[in-house]
């Protein structure tokens, strides 16, 4: 079958032919319709330090997708041929304390689709049926293809009560923008997103944020004054992984504020811990999606009117995958969707 693979330990992704994956007793086989390019895929393309330590070569990559069930393992129940599905990209062990306690997103033995085992940039993907999620009929293939990153946004945003709260989102990548949109949709008062990338700040404006702030040109304190905020932000969502951005977020938080951190710093990060201690801040780390509460909430949010379509800015047939990666690497894109139809 046709697949996009990391074939060499150097920059790039290559189209190749690989054997069709084998179906296990507890697996389903998915014929891929659409895939989306994740920032992780860009790291793998660039062959950065993390990728060199993590990704086996050769490897079929990709983990954002939607497709149709075409084969079902003999032990599988609850799925039928023809079901439209996406799937949780974190495959868990089922026997560690967190898995047995129902906290599977915290499994200490997680294996990543398209990271540690063959991924979805291929005509067919096999995953455990446990990981598959049926897509409701009124959700499009394009939106279903970005459920993985949307889930990161939903998990982060819904970590805390948002109704009537003032929220600062640090980092206007696609996940940060979607998180900001979720905050507005569920009833936050002011949702401010901060970045230095004007293209992505414009995308955030299209998604309905209260203010999109280019922090290279504007001061967050001035924005807070403009919005009539007499105290700091109640909720902070750190989506950038940039140490200066996190320090700025800490400076802007109200006493007793709550922070959810999804962005991954490139190395050890120093902060002024006095901000955390004397403000009584609560900081929660976010990894992936809650299985499968986040998935049900994603579907419900879209069905209740949350419009994510502006975040999908580029669409290419799979044979033009290089243009998709070029768009992602340029920093002037939202989500990029590749069609396998």
From Swiss-Prot:
GO CC entries: cytoplasm
InterPro entries assigned to the protein according to its UniProt record, in alphabetical order: ADH-like_C (IPR013149), ADH-like_N (IPR013154), ADH_Zn_CS (IPR002328), GroES-like_sf (IPR011032), L-Threonine_3-DHase (IPR004627), NAD(P)-bd_dom_sf (IPR036291), PKS_ER (IPR020843), Zn_alcohol_dh (IPR050129)
Single GO MF annotation: zinc ion binding
Organism: Yersinia pestis
Family: Belongs to the zinc-containing alcohol dehydrogenase family.
Cofactor binding annotation: Binds 2 Zn(2+) ions per subunit.
Cofactor: Zn(2+)
One Pfam short name: ADH_N
Keyword Zinc: yes
EC number in record: 1.1.1.103
The name this protein goes by in its record: L-threonine 3-dehydrogenase
PROSITE patterns: ADH_ZINC
Reactions listed under catalytic activity: L-threonine + NAD(+) = (2S)-2-amino-3-oxobutanoate + NADH + H(+)
Main location class: cytoplasm
Site description Important for catalytic activity for the proton relay mechanism but does not participate directly in the coordination of zinc atom, residues in chain: 148
UniProt keyword Glycoprotein, yes or no: no
Role noted for this protein: Catalyzes the NAD(+)-dependent oxidation of L-threonine to 2-amino-3-ketobutyrate.
Gene3D superfamilies on file: Medium-chain alcohol dehydrogenases, catalytic domain (3.90.180.10), NAD(P)-binding Rossmann-like Domain (3.40.50.720)
Pathway the protein acts in: Amino-acid degradation; L-threonine degradation via oxydo-reductase pathway; glycine from L-threonine: step 1/2
Keyword set, alphabetical order: Cytoplasm, Metal-binding, NAD, Oxidoreductase, Zinc
Residues annotated as binding NAD(+): 175, 195, 200, 262-264, 286-287
Ligand binding (Zn(2+) 2): 93, 96, 99, 107
